[in-house]
Amino acid sequence: MPAALTRRSAMALSAVCLSCLMFGLEISSIPAILPTLERKLHADFKQLQWIMNAYTIAVTTVLMATGTLADRYGRKRIFMIATAAFGVTSLSCGVTENVLTLIVARFLQGLSGGAMLICQIAVLSHQFQGGRERATAFGWWGVIFGIGLGFGPIIGGAIAALLSWTWVFLIHVVFAILAILLAIGGIQESRDPKAGSLDLAGMLTLSLSVFCLAFYITQGPDLGFGSATGLTILGAAIASLIAFLIAEKVSPRPMFDVLVFRIPAFSGAVVGSAAMNISFWPFMIYLPIWFQAGLGYDSVTAGLALLAYTVPTLVMPPLGERLSLRYRPGVVIPAGLFTIGAGFMLMKLGSAAAQPDWLTMLPGCLIAGIGLGLTNTPVTNTTTGSVTSDRAGMASGIDISARMVSLTVNIAVMGFLLASGVLAHLEDALPDSPDAGELWPLAERIAAGNAVSVPGLPEAVVHEALAQGFGWVMLYGGIGVWALAGVSFVIFRTRSLQPAE
């Protein structure tokens, strides 16, 4: 820790960094153990998706509300409560022996994690107000967050191999206790006497809309996308979204001030946030399945292979920021997104090789990671820098919410495409195969990485089916991020519909 910081400030920064390490690890380490959870807890493919989506939906639910609560009741107090809750819910995740209980515990963990994330920013913003100290604090916060995200796969895989999958969750109990002890002596309490009221209507309608859409996509094959039940759920998602927009328009203190979307730089950057989560981050949920079930690697080797995908996201942001200052975010953000898409197309080619392995996947993984690293920092800085200082907190909340919402939806979309690609190959490869409805459960088992326990099905057919499914997902990720790169590029070049105050 830099010597320039006082002892109390160093303790506060250490507490915040420990909590952001926990949050980052819970996003990136869990994908590495999904194949293990499938075996140990007998989780099916949909349940694996909900283990991830329960967390992201919960984070989205609590993000904006926590900022208001922290301003009103004390940022230190809410930070400590959220961190303690994260430790307790992590303990619940680690001791469960039932997948449904794990999904519920993951939702509760996401609520506490989202609250913890917002409090981290609030604590740092208040405690480190000098220019140099502030830069140091946020610099360390970003580095530790990046380590959690970038090295999470290998950390999760190593813990699962050396100890047990349960310790991927239980380790956070230790971190949470340390963070709370540091926070007690280090973080200064602060409040905002002008804190507004909670936007409960906005919070609930947005969360309901995201949940219903994710549920419709994930459970649609079983319910029937065109069935009365399926259409009712889809209708609820649309109605909730409309209700959210109305609530934000009439609320005196909305979570989302829709007027900021009239600022092209802000809107273009938010599209960039969504684009990263239509491709890069949701695919990290499924890539360990390909490395383990498709390429035959164990959890540690799969985690090492994933470093090619994640490490560039740690080393490229400084270059992305320099390029943004030189060529403008409106050029760098779409270019970074285009690079991610190129990486996905190369991964698709690598997975379709006659004998695919980590070397055939390496170029695409590296290029996708480089593209993410070039894009992420300019997106964050542009969303907050394109609005006035009094709107910066709201702009940051919209940015994070856009990431979480698009991540949640695209975890479901990629899962559906993966299973659909597997199903399409099975229908072509198996003579006299039953109809799609009967083959769908088998396709989901293969998509979950459960290829070994498919009796009577040639191993080559299983592998080819899995490869086709992942090919569909990579194609979707590449085309999707390219499309949004084009949208972002166009938006950046439109005239502002209102002055960027």
Please give the residue ranges for each predicted region.
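Transmembrane-helix bundle of Major Facilitator Superfamily
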Residues: 1-185, 327, 348
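12-transmembrane solute porter fold
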Residues: 11-25, 30-32, 201, 228-236, ...
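Interfacial helix-cap and linker-helix signal at transmembrane-aqueous boundaries
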Residues: 37-38, 69-70, 155-163, 217, ...
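Hydrophobic transmembrane-helix bundles of small-molecule transporters
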Residues: 139, 161-273, 279, 297, ...
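A membrane-interface helix-boundary motif in multi-pass transporters
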Residues: 161-173, 219-230, 420-479
